[in-house]
């Protein structure tokens, strides 16, 4: 319901205005003061000895940051660089922090997105509630670059390159701060970053257009790959920032979806609640982010759909050149 207020001009927004506006103003004041304290030196920030690239956004919810992080890691790896990824590890509870992921780390330890990034890229991935602590851990691994998954507003960590990922269809909603609107920072922040990435929709001036390109569906148990359109009676579910985006992708791929179910972002699934979805169809299809949480109890009729960030060739080269220049 809150997203309908933020993005769809729902009438409840007007009814709740007297309650939400003061909270929104307080959020803005705290966020602005916190940023000012770090920029003025009143609060100390950490400067890494390794170039730091921040991939974040100014709105709450999923905008497609993780595919951008994966793309950056893979591109830099292809140039021979060793890359580390720092994350807050939301949704996980590690035995200690900072925590360096291994090939066997599970989402309940580190959170779902760090596991996805580790599995896709084999990069060094570290998590800590204070991102600068994760960065320090990665420095010890001898990485050439550190990319932070989210953390644009974590001003306790200095950075060399900043990306803002924008949902090209929903944009910035009603342009109010949380909780009246989706903003973590004001739209004026857009003018101060190195790259604005527009995920879907129509990119605007000074924005780099990005598309999430789906590949074949992959079976969670066997690893078999099949085209989505060849799968029948699919039940689709997603526990991501904006589930309708996943369902729309399936529709574009002409998937035979008979039921959809959205869950909150970073949800820790119980086997029974996923198994119950099977009553609506013959097979399940989910996002890659959800698959890392369901892998341990997956059934042979469960599939996931990986997506890859794609950019115009010229823009992709500009992005890489800018990052590599920092190192040189």
Curated annotation (Swiss-Prot):
GO molecular-function terms, A-Z: ATP binding; tetraacyldisaccharide 4'-kinase activity
Q: Which InterPro entries match?
A: LpxK, P-loop_NTPase
* One annotated Gene Ontology cellular component of this protein: plasma membrane
Q: In which pathway does it act?
A: Glycolipid biosynthesis; lipid IV(A) biosynthesis; lipid IV(A) from (3R)-3-hydroxytetradecanoyl-[acyl-carrier-protein] and UDP-N-acetyl-alpha-D-glucosamine: step 6/6
Q: Name one Pfam family in it.
A: LpxK
Q: Which EC number(s) are documented for this chain?
A: 2.7.1.130
Q: Which domain of life is it from?
A: Bacteria
Please list the residues that bind ATP: 59-66
Its GO biological process terms? lipid A biosynthetic process; lipopolysaccharide core region biosynthetic process
- Does the UniProt entry include the keyword Thylakoid? no
Under HAMAP family, the record lists: LpxK
Say which family it is in.
Belongs to the LpxK family.
The record, for PANTHER family, names: TETRAACYLDISACCHARIDE 4'-KINASE, TETRAACYLDISACCHARIDE 4'-KINASE, MITOCHONDRIAL-RELATED
Protein name from the UniProt record: Tetraacyldisaccharide 4'-kinase
Species name for this entry? Aliivibrio fischeri (strain ATCC 700601 / ES114) (Vibrio fischeri)
């Amino acid at each position: 319901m809150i997203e309908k207020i933020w993005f769809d001009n729902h009438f409840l927004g007007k009814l709740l205005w007297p309650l939400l506006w003061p909270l929104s103003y307080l959020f803005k004041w705290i966020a602005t003061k916190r940023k000012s304290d770090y920029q003025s030196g009143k609060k100390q920030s950490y400067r890494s000895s390794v170039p730091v690239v921040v991939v974040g956004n100014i709105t709450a919810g999923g905008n497609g940051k993780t595919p951008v992080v994966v793309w950056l890691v893979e591109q830099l790896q292809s140039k021979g660089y060793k890359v580390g990824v720092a994350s807050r590890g939301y949704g996980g509870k590690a035995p200690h922090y900072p925590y360096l992921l291994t090939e066997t780390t599970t989402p309940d330890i580190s959170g779902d997105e760090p596991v996805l990034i580790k599995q896709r890229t084999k990069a060094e991935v570290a998590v800590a509630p204070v991102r600068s602590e994760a960065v320090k851990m990665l420095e010890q691994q001898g990485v050439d670059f550190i990319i932070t998954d989210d953390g644009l507003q974590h001003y306790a960590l200095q950075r060399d390159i900043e990306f803002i990922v924008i949902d090209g269809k929903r944009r910035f909603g009603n342009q109010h701060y949380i909780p009246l609107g989706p903003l973590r920072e004001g739209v004026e922040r857009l003018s101060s970053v190195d790259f604005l990435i527009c995920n879907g929709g129509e990119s605007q001036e000074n924005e780099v257009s990005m598309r999430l390109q789906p590949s074949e569906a992959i079976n969670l148990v066997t690893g078999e790959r099949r085209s989505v359109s060849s799968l029948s009676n699919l039940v689709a579910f997603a526990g991501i920032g904006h589930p309708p985006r996943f369902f729309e992708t399936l529709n574009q791929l002409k998937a035979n979806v008979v039921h959809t179910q959205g869950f909150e972002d970073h949800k820790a699934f119980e086997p029974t609640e996923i198994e119950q979805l099977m009553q609506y169809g013959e097979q399940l299809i989910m996002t890659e982010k959800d698959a890392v949480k369901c892998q341990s109890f997956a059934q042979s009729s469960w599939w996931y759909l990986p997506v890859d960030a794609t950019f115009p060739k010229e823009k992709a080269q500009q992005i890489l050149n800018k990052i590599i220049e920092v190192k040189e």
